[in-house]
Amino acid sequence: QKNKLKYLVGKVDMIESVDSEELIRLIDKRAQNLGIVQDILIEVNIGGEASKSGVKPEEVEALVALAASLPGVEPRGLMAIPPVAHEPGANRAVFAAMRQLFIDIKGKTYNNKVNIDCLSMGMSGDFEDAIAEGATQVRVGTALFGARPANRVNG
């Protein structure tokens, strides 16, 4: 969300859901104004779901190259939130596709500017498969803290 960037840039180690050229340029501008370099992850819509944000896999390389060319941002890798899995192993192929995309991006030099080292994918229900497919970060909030309470309507 563009309106929250002014609160994030320089206050978090990494912005993990960057999915457009516009966001990259806004982060770069804010980071330069602060005299810092902001680490980012490019969010990939690996499942092609209309309900999820993220770029198409074929758009990733151009965004990483753009970020690598700007002084205020450093692309560190990729992140994805997989489709909801209703059975164990259901997202294994999705994680394998993300791993291959990560390997492809990591293999590019981008003028030796970047250190692509983060593959963020997998959640409480499928993190083991994500790790087996190369994830370096997982989201396991539900496993640690339990399910979020259902939304309540105040009345």
Predicted regions and their residues:
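C-terminal helical cap(s) of enzyme catalytic domains, especially alpha/beta-barrels
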Residues: I131-G155
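Conserved alpha/beta-domain cores
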Residues: Q1-G125, I131-E133, F145-A147
